[in-house]
């Protein structure tokens, strides 16, 4: 499992102060890209190999509202590979370990 820490930024909020769905997806995508880099497949290496990551679908379940300036831990792990296609799980946790979002991508 790969984890990284982030903080909810002002630009991640909508006019009502709620975290925008695209911001949540960005947290998840960043986790996947950072995980790939940690195992030797950063953006430069992927370009050398003429490879890229493509997310075909998201399944996201949201918990309580994520707040501005809240410290988050984002977790990710790959699973169920079929050749070059695989799934990836994600969780976003509060500083207290509360699950704020869960997701799968493929």
Language model features with spans:
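HotDog/MaoC-like acyl-thioester-processing domains
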Residues: 2, 61-106
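Small beta-barrel nucleic-acid-binding modules, principally OB-folds
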Residues: 51-65
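Hot-dog-fold acyl-thioester-processing enzymes
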Residues: 1-55, 102
């Amino acid at each position: 499992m790969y984890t990284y820490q982030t903080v909810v930024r002002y630009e991640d909020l909508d006019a009502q102060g709620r975290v925008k769905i695209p911001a949540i997806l960005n947290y998840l995508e960043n986790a996947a890209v950072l995980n790939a880099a940690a195992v030797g497949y950063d953006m430069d290496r992927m370009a050398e190999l003429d490879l890229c990551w493509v997310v075909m679908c998201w399944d996201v379940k949201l918990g309580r509202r994520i707040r501005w300036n809240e410290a988050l831990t984002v977790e990710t792990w790959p699973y169920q590979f079929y050749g070059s296609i695989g799934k990836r799980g994600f969780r976003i946790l509060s500083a207290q370990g509360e699950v704020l979002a869960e997701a799968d991508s493929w």
